[in-house]
């Protein structure tokens, strides 16, 4: 499929990257689909970077209620991130979260999610002082030396008591 030696090597590398990303010990011949997937990945990473640089434009949080099974009361919520891009439309979390992790953008993104979720929880505590907000952290965030000070600063800024925050590891860990 290549016209030049350089293209041949480039396409072989794309196929190798694809094979590694989709399971070990695989042999994958290059196809135009691999190039299309790689192009989409690069475009999404660039758009994620732009969204973050422009104040997390297109990102929003939705909240999954956590309900007490005994009495049906909402006792907390889990913060879930969503992203809509003008050029790409609604991008599923299963697609954009791994790209944030691979690119290192998960660190500023995760800090934004944490702060926004804590702001929301602090407001919702007016209805129920025992309300608990759960936030998922990526393994990349756990490696950050600034994580604990960042959480402490956000707790202080939002007035959310530490007992009202649950920090969880993402499933990708």
What are these language model-derived features?
Residues 1, 27, 37, 69, ...:
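Catalytic core of bacterial c-di-GMP phosphodiesterases, primarily the EAL and HD-GYP domains
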Residues 1-22, 28-47, 95, 99, ...:
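Cyclic nucleotide signaling catalytic output domains
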Residues 22-25, 57, 163:
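Flexible, glycine-biased helix-capping/connector loops in cytosolic signal-transduction modules
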Residues 29, 40-99, 136, 168:
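Active-site core of bacterial EAL-family cyclic-dinucleotide phosphodiesterase domains
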